[in-house]
Amino acid sequence: MIKVENVDVWGFEHAIRGMRNPMNSWDKSDSKFDVQTYWDEENTLEAEHYDAIIGMSDLDLMRRLYKAGTEHRKYLRQISVSMDITAPLYWWKEFDTYKVGTTSNSCSTMHKIAEKEFELDDFSYEQLSGNSVSVLNDLIDWLNFERREYRRTKSKAYWWQMIQLLPSSYNQKRTITMNYENVANIIHQRKCHKLDEWVEFCQELEKLPYVSEIMYEG
């Protein structure tokens, strides 16, 4: 299970301006910025809630620089995105390999593990068979026993039982900030991954403003 919410994207204006610095081609820029809604000449809604409406001249240059490689597409690293992601610990373990250009703030398992009772929906279990779900439910019951004893006695020994018994299917929420270069790398490296969470996450990334238009030429 993976859930992506509270997505925010910014930085198109300065990224495109900087993209045109090497050739002093600012006069060729045809994008519109800070637009909530934009209507064409036939009164048809073209875009809504975008930080920018990228013109075809700018988009063409963005595509060519993207194809030219990381040393030429520095503008991608100037477009930022933040989002809240809820995903199992086994997925976060792999996400944590993306260190450069990413910042993460997580809900604390260490501090908040005993705050509420454990429930089945706190875990990713959609691929488990019936017998395996029963095993997980038994584990949840035991975790809740350790939780009650910890809250009753304040003994750290019970806290340790929860920490070391907690399975990697436990879902954790984090707020992530990264840039479009990170986005492109993740899509390229993970869109056909064995884990469903990676496939679904890449699909969410492809929905970000202009990601597909840049990477796949529309």
For the regions a protein language model found, what residue spans apply to each?
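Family-specific signature for flavin-dependent thymidylate synthase
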Residues: 1-218
